Amino acid sequence: MIGCAKPLAAPLQAWARPPSPAGRRLPPSFCAPDTSPALTRAVESPGQSQSDDAPPPRSGEAASSLAPRASSHLDRWSRSRALRSGHRPALNRAALSSASVSAPPVIKSPRPEDAAVAAEDGEDDDVCEAERDAAAGKAIYIVSDGTGWTAEHSVNAALGQFENCLADRGCAVNTHLFSLIDDMDRLIEVIKQAAKEGALVLYTLADPSMAEATKKACDFWGVPCTDVLRPTVEAIASHIGVAPSGIPRSFPSRNGRLSEDYFQRIDAIDFTIKQDDGVLPQNFYRADIVLAGVSRTGKTPLSIYLAQKGYKVANVPIVMGVALPKSLFEINQDKVFGLTINPAILQGIRKTRAKTLGFDGRQSNYAEMDHVRQELVHANQIFVQNPWWPVIAVTGKAIEETAAVILGILHDRKQKCSMPRISKRY
C-alpha cells in the first residue's frame, strides 16, 4: 500500500480537492495529474485510502475530478500543443515520484473530438507564437504581482553572463513575463503551464503567503523556482530593523497618493521632449544635463532614458558651419557632456537612417565616410576647446551603460566623494 502524500498549504489543499459532480469537464487533452490509482490516493486528504485492487477510474472522470478550473487561454495552449505534437506532454512530478512508481502516466493520442474542439475555438498554428517557439529553447517564467520589470531586468542582466552561448543558439532561452498575478488561481495555472514546458520559475511576490504558496506548488509539480527579491528584502529588513509590509507595488491603497518622485519624472520628461535637438537654448540653465554630439550619436534616446529617471536633459547637435548656442557656454559647465562614436559605426547608422528617409548618395553626403570623419573631427575640436566637458565614446555601449557613466560623473562632481557613486535619498 502506498501512503498518502504530504498535503500542501491551505491554498493548494483547496485546489487539490475534487470538485463537485456538477463541475465543468476539461477538454480531453488538458494536462491533468496522472489518473493512476496510486496518484489518486496521493492527492486525497489525510486519513483517506483505497484498496490496491480497486478498479481504476475512467480517464475522463479522473481528469474531471482532479483538474482545477483553468483559464481558457492556458487551456488552449495545452490543447493546441497536443494537436500539433500528436501527444500530450509529460508532466515533471519529481515531488510525487514515490507515489507514481506503481502506475505509469497515461499518454493520450489526439482524437477527432479534440480536433473538433480546436476548430470550434478557431485554433491554428498562429494561436500563440510563444507556444510554438518554446521547443526552440529553455523556458523561463517571470511571475510578479506588479509590472514584473524588476524581475525582468534582473533576468536580462543574468542572461548577459551567457551571451556567447545564446548568440550561437547553443543554449537558446525564451522568457515569458506574467505580471499582476495577485490571486491563487492564476498563480496555480501559471505554475502548471511551467511544469508542462519544463520551465524555470523566477518570481517577485511581495505577499509572503503568495510567495510561500509558489514555492510549495513548484515543489509539488517538480518545477525549479527562485524568489528574486526575498533575499534582498530580508537583508534590508535585518539591516534597518523594520519588518517589510508585504504589500505589492500595484496594491490600490499604495498607489492612492502620487509621490513627489513621480511628478519629478513627469516634469523631467516634459522638459526633455521640448528641448530636443537644440530647441529653446535659453532654457539650458534649467537642465540637469546637457548632451552635445554630432547627428546619430544617440542624444535623443539617451535624453529620454535619463528623463525617465527624473533628470531634465537638453541636447545640442554639433553641425559643421553652424555655431553652437551662446547659452551652452554660459551655463554651469559641470553638466555638459560630449558624445562621440566610431566613424565606421556612425556611417552604418546614417546609411540606415538615410534609407528610411528616402535619401540616396547623390542627394546628400550625410552618410559618406569623408563627411562623417570631418564631422567627428570638428566635434573633437570643440571638445578640446572645452576640456571640462567629459567626452563619452558610445560605440558598442547600451543607453543604460552610457547613462550610468554620465550619472556617476555628475553625482561625483556634486558630492565630491572619495569614491564615485550615484546617491538617492528615500
From Swiss-Prot:
<dbReference type="GO" id="GO:0009570">
    <property type="term" value="C:chloroplast stroma"/>
</dbReference>
<dbReference type="InterPro" id="IPR005177">
    <property type="entry name" value="Kinase-pyrophosphorylase"/>
</dbReference>
<keyword id="KW-0808">Transferase</keyword>
<comment type="function">
    <text>Bifunctional serine/threonine kinase and phosphorylase involved in the dark/light-mediated regulation of PPDK by catalyzing its phosphorylation/dephosphorylation. Dark/light-induced changes in stromal concentrations of the competing ADP and Pi substrates govern the direction of the reaction. In the dark, phosphorylates the catalytic intermediate of PPDK (PPDK-HisP), inactivating it. Light exposure induces the phosphorolysis reaction that reactivates PPDK.</text>
</comment>
<dbReference type="GO" id="GO:0016776">
    <property type="term" value="F:phosphotransferase activity, phosphate group as acceptor"/>
</dbReference>
<feature type="region of interest" description="Disordered">
    <location>
        <begin position="1"/>
        <end position="76"/>
    </location>
</feature>
<feature type="compositionally biased region" description="Low complexity">
    <location>
        <begin position="94"/>
        <end position="119"/>
    </location>
</feature>
<dbReference type="InterPro" id="IPR017409">
    <property type="entry name" value="Pyrv_Pi_dikinase_reg_chlpt"/>
</dbReference>
<dbReference type="Pfam" id="PF03618">
    <property type="entry name" value="Kinase-PPPase"/>
</dbReference>
<comment type="subunit">
    <text>homodimer at pH 7.5 and homotetramer at pH 8.3.</text>
</comment>
<keyword id="KW-0723">Serine/threonine-protein kinase</keyword>
<keyword id="KW-0418">Kinase</keyword>
<keyword id="KW-0150">Chloroplast</keyword>
<dbReference type="InterPro" id="IPR026565">
    <property type="entry name" value="PPDK_reg"/>
</dbReference>
<comment type="similarity">
    <text>Belongs to the pyruvate, phosphate/water dikinase regulatory protein family. PDRP subfamily.</text>
</comment>
<comment type="pathway">
    <text>Photosynthesis; C4 acid pathway.</text>
</comment>
<keyword id="KW-0934">Plastid</keyword>
<keyword id="KW-0547">Nucleotide-binding</keyword>
<feature type="region of interest" description="Disordered">
    <location>
        <begin position="94"/>
        <end position="124"/>
    </location>
</feature>
<dbReference type="GO" id="GO:0005524">
    <property type="term" value="F:ATP binding"/>
</dbReference>
<protein>
    <recommendedName>
        <fullName>Pyruvate, phosphate dikinase regulatory protein, chloroplastic</fullName>
        <ecNumber>2.7.11.32</ecNumber>
        <ecNumber>2.7.4.27</ecNumber>
    </recommendedName>
</protein>
<feature type="binding site">
    <location>
        <begin position="153"/>
        <end position="160"/>
    </location>
    <ligand>
        <name>ADP</name>
    </ligand>
</feature>
<keyword id="KW-0809">Transit peptide</keyword>
<dbReference type="GO" id="GO:0004674">
    <property type="term" value="F:protein serine/threonine kinase activity"/>
</dbReference>
<feature type="transit peptide" description="Chloroplast">
    <location>
        <begin position="1"/>
        <end position="41"/>
    </location>
</feature>
